[in-house]
Amino acid sequence: MQVSVENTSALERRMTIGVPAERIETEVNKRLQQTARKAKIPGFRPGKVPMSVIRQRYEDGARQEALGDLIQATFYEAVVEQKLNPAGAPAVEPKSFEKGKDLEYVATFEVFPEFTVAGFDTIAVERLSADVVDSDLDNMLEVLRKQNVRFEVADRAAQNEDQLNIDFVGKVDGEVFAGGSATATQLVLGSGRMIPGFEDGLVGAKAGEERVLNVTFPEDYQNLELAGKAAEFTVTVNTVSEPKLPELNEEFFKQFGIKETGIEGFRTEVRKNMERELRQAIKSKVKNQVMDGLLAANPIEVPKALLENEVNRLRVQAVQQFGGNIKPDQLPAELFEEQAKRRVELGLIVAEVVKQFDLKPDDARVREMIQEMASAYQEPEQVVAWYYKNEQQMNEVRSVVLEEQVVDTVLQKASVTDKSVSYEEAVKPVEAPKAD
């Protein structure tokens, strides 16, 4: 077998492979002999059909099958011989395909980039630390109460946090516009659900009152036909209802499936959940900084095939998440290219760190992670048992643990600054940078 390789770009390879005619004929004859043993042809006993008859009837099909298998087999033999690591399937172009002659074909494909992860000492990480103090716990209890608020009709003027039942008709340039009208809609004042000025304009309104609100759609409003335009809404208030927060009692505690009784038992369980959330938030922020640092210090070119595969995965995830009748390939690839590129780059860089430092998932950390996740459930022992019986889930946990070990490895070499902050600051999501 003859092999030559041409580097057509940083990652693309054009490999020409020649397969001797003798090898082709051997494979063709092998298939014809297999066919002869089971062929049923009128006038001949099974297994006794002359090879000349078998060849006349079946040689073309056997040759096509043999050539297809040989191209696949010799391609992988060639990449092993040339020490290449293909990233995706090759595009195959036959050059010589004549019977009785050597087979020659060209395989064009991309390879994984070869690089060494460096620049660990250029990575700067701010590692937060925080505690759950009593005031944080009190605030969380109020949040839980507000999440379970109920509303009672009140005979008074509307205030912020009241729930109004309203009918409204919206007009732009004196014309009713699509989606601008509704009846019997529930609206909590101050929720920010409506465009600026709408909810504020209903503060002080009473049941049965009609108000005309003059507002302006934001410049970045999702409906471009309405963005930046002035609108007039005629609103009729049907009812005004005031919020009633639930009492912190046994009935309230049961809604959260907490076995501990009494306010102190409830506070203890809520604190545990907050501490678990805090640990995850701090860990996530450190990981994001490490990954950002690795990307900045190690710019690499990634194979187009991997990017396309990742874009397609993100398309499928988007359809599964948001539903609807749309098909994944109907979503524009541009929506996912930036995220796909980051994920592919990080996947390659993280894999290389694992290889460079010979990292393997730590069994103790795997157990600890499973127990941490299980502690959020009412029957943690059952959750732990479920994980250990499910190999796919175990592999996912091992993968997460291995990423954490990569982060720890980088932190040992990076510039790390510790900073003490409040619980609220520690768990606050990091805002994505705005596009220019």
From Swiss-Prot:
Where does this one sit in the cell?
Cytoplasm
- Pfam families recorded: FKBP_C, Trigger_C, Trigger_N
Q: Which InterPro entries match?
A: PPIase_dom_sf, PPIase_FKBP_dom, Trig_fac, Trigger_fac_C, Trigger_fac_C_sf, Trigger_fac_ribosome-bd_bac, Trigger_fac_ribosome-bd_sf, Trigger_fact/SurA_dom_sf
- Residue span, PPIase FKBP-type domain: 161-246
**What are its GO biological-process terms?**
'de novo' cotranslational protein folding; cell division; chaperone-mediated protein folding; protein transport; protein unfolding
Per the record, what are the reactions this protein catalyses?
[protein]-peptidylproline (omega=180) = [protein]-peptidylproline (omega=0)
The signal sequence is none
> A Gene Ontology molecular-function term?
ribosome binding
EC annotation?
Answer: 5.2.1.8
Summarize the protein's role.
Answer: Involved in protein export. Acts as a chaperone by maintaining the newly synthesized protein in an open conformation. Functions as a peptidyl-prolyl cis-trans isomerase.
Q: How are the domains described in the entry?
A: Consists of 3 domains; the N-terminus binds the ribosome, the middle domain has PPIase activity, while the C-terminus has intrinsic chaperone activity on its own.
**UniProt name for this protein:** Trigger factor
Gene it is expressed from: tig
